[in-house]
């Protein structure tokens, strides 16, 4: 099953005949593999780890699958397809990345849902691309085409990072935020509640849904001897977290994980402001899986503490998995849930 943007690309796949194709920011479908019907070869770079895991089992000699904020090589392509990102500030970064990998006069295709901001594509395209031309309008999506007409500046993460000081209960820390990663540039209420009641931890600790590394840096500021692991599904968040830790002279293991699936062993502590805020059935089930898996991966005497929107149905799930839990603090928007393993 292809998403609507992918169906629009298939409608126009004749422009890819015998091309070496790169697909950037692809979705959780098999579009890159489907393009092998016409393309010479396809490489796919996912910025969402779920999307990578969906496609990776289909890799073959003509289809290479990658996850991250950049490719691990400098290969050039006849066509680069960009899925317009949900986080609009990420779009210019993806265009710069596309330009690094296009042959001279190579083809750029940009697809996105009408409501997702792709309509502003012509204004957003950098000057090293020709003016964007609308190629198709179908499935509530738009497809634009362009070509590389000039040399693009070399891509440097520092050009796409905002760095700022953040005051936390543990002291001031430096945060590095790449484009496309959510940031309020001040401590949000949920994280502030969590950090204001941070337990004393020891040993191996997991920061689930680490984002740009705010909780990780605050944790290590207060408790620098922790063996910390930071996981997320977003490539830009993981890169931001690594930059944040480096800026503060801290070290932790930072890696992608689908829930806790890519973690191993048990933890002495699990801390999170989990990224489940919308109350949708899909994210509620992910949240429930996180709670259930956490219960299995907590060491004896291990501490589990998360902050969550008080209107979300966490209490029943947590009570079912952990039995007894405490609410050390709450306000009108958030609750702090805490549990210590027997």
Swiss-Prot record:
Organism: Shewanella sp. (strain MR-4)
Annotated compartments: Cytoplasm
GO cellular component: cytoplasm
A UniProt-annotated Pfam family: MTS
This protein's name: Ribosomal RNA small subunit methyltransferase C
EC number of the protein: 2.1.1.172
Gene that specifies this protein: rsmC
Job description of the protein: Specifically methylates the guanine in position 1207 of 16S rRNA in the 30S particle.
Record's keyword terms, sorted: Cytoplasm, Methyltransferase, rRNA processing, S-adenosyl-L-methionine, Transferase
Annotated catalysed reactions: guanosine(1207) in 16S rRNA + S-adenosyl-L-methionine = N(2)-methylguanosine(1207) in 16S rRNA + S-adenosyl-L-homocysteine + H(+)
Cell division found in the keyword field: no
Record-linked SUPFAM superfamilies: S-adenosyl-L-methionine-dependent methyltransferases
Subunit structure: Monomer.
GO molecular function, one term: 16S rRNA (guanine(1207)-N(2))-methyltransferase activity
The keyword Methyltransferase belongs to this UniProt entry's keyword annotation: yes
UniProt xrefs under InterPro entries: DNA_methylase_N6_adenine_CS, Mtase_sm_N, rRNA_ssu_MeTfrase_C, RsmC/RlmG, SAM-dependent_MTases_sf, Small_mtfrase_dom
Family stated for the protein in its record: Belongs to the methyltransferase superfamily. RsmC family.
Highest rank taxon of the organism: Bacteria
């Amino acid at each position: 099953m292809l998403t609507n943007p992918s169906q629009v690309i298939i409608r126009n796949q004749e422009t890819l005949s015998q091309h070496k194709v790169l697909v950037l920011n692809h979705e959780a479908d098999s579009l890159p593999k489907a393009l092998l019907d016409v393309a010479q070869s396809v490489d796919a770079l996912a910025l969402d780890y779920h999307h990578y895991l969906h496609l990776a089992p289909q890799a073959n000699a003509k289809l290479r699958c990658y996850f991250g904020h950049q490719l691990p090589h400098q290969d050039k392509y006849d066509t680069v397809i960009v899925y317009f990102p949900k986080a609009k500030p990420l779009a210019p970064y993806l265009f710069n990345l596309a330009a690094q990998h296009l042959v001279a006069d190579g083809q750029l295709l940009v697809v996105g849902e009408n409501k997702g901001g792709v309509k502003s594509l012509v204004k957003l395209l950098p000057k090293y691309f020709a003016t964007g031309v609308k190629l198709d309008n179908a499935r509530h999506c738009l497809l634009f085409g362009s070509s590389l007409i000039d040399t693009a500046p070399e891509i440097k993460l520092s050009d796409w990072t905002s760095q700022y000081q953040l005051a936390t209960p543990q002291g001031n820390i430096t945060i590095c935020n790449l484009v496309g990663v959510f940031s309020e540039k001040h401590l949000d209420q949920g994280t502030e509640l969590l950090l204001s009641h941070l337990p004393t931890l020891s040993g191996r600790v997991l920061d689930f849904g680490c984002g740009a590394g705010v909780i990780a840096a605050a944790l290590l500021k207060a408790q620098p001897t922790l063996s910390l692991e930071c996981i997320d599904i977003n490539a830009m968040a993981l890169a931001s977290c690594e930059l944040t830790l480096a800026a503060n002279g801290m070290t932790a293991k930072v890696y992608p994980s689908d829930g806790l699936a890519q973690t191993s062993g048990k933890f002495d502590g699990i801390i999170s402001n989990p990224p489940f805020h919308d109350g949708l059935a899909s994210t509620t089930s992910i949240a429930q899986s996180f709670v259930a898996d956490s219960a299995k991966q907590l060491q004896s005497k291990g501490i589990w503490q998360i902050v969550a929107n008080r209107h979300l149905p966490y209490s029943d799930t947590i009570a079912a998995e952990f039995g007894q839990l405490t609410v050390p603090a709450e306000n009108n928007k958030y609750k702090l849930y805490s549990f210590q393993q027997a």
